[in-house]
Amino acid sequence: MEKEKNVEINTIPKLFWNSVKSRADRVAMREKDLGIWQEISWTVYGEKAKLTGLALHTLGLKKDDVVSIASEGMPEWLYTDMGTIGAGGISSGIYTTDSAEQVKYLVNDSSTKFYFAENEEQLDKILEVRSECPTLKQIIVFDMEGLNEFHDDQVISYEEFLKIGEKANLEKPDLWESLINNVNSSD
C-alpha cells in the first residue's frame, strides 16, 4: 500500500482512508446475495463509511459518543463502524441474540446516542426499552423489510440516513477529512 505524501498515518481512520484512496477499485470485501458473491470495492466501502460518518456528525455525534450496532456481520455493519470511528465516535457491537433487557443494559451502560438495528427483530428490542434509555437520540434500521408502514420520529431507514450524509458532503466537501484528522491516536 502506497502512503499518501505528507500524511502521517497514525490512527485507524487515517489508515482506512489511505487504503480507500490507494486501493480504490480493488475488492475490499465480498457479500453473498442470493447465493452469488458480490464484490464491494474500497471506493464503495469508503463512500458508505464517509456518508455514515457525515450523517452521524450532522445529527449531533460528538467526540467519544457511542454508536451501538445490533446486526449480524454485513457490509452495513462495517460502514457504520468505520464511519463512527472516523467521525470521532466509539463503535459498540450488540449481539443479535441479546434480549431487550440486555440491549437496555448495554445502551445505558455505554450511554449510546445512536443505535443501528439490522432489521425489524432488532428494532423491536430497542423500541421495547427505549423509554428507559435516556441518552438514545436516533435509531437507524439497515433492512426495512416489513416496516414500510412503520413511522416513528426517532427511527429512520439506513437509506434515509445516508441521504443526510450526502447532503452534508455536498454542503461541506472537506468535512470528512477534517473529522478524520481530528481523531488522535490517544483517543
Residue ranges and their predicted role:
Residues M1-I12:
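Flexible, non-catalytic linker and terminal segments flanking ANL/adenylate-forming cores
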Residues L15-I40, G146-L147:
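AMP-dependent adenylate-forming
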Residues W17, G53, V103-K104, E177-I180:
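Short hydrophobic/charged patches on amphipathic alpha-helices used for structural packing
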Residues A24-D25, V155-I156, K163-D187:
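Conserved pre-ATP/AMP-binding loop-to-beta segment of ANL
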Residues A28-M82, S99-K104, Q154-L162:
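Conserved AMP-binding/adenylate-forming core of the ANL superfamily
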Residues R30-K32, I69, L136, V141, ...:
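Domain-wide signal for the mature, well-folded portions of proteins, strongly enriched
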Residues G86-I164:
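Structural core segment of the AMP-binding/adenylate-forming
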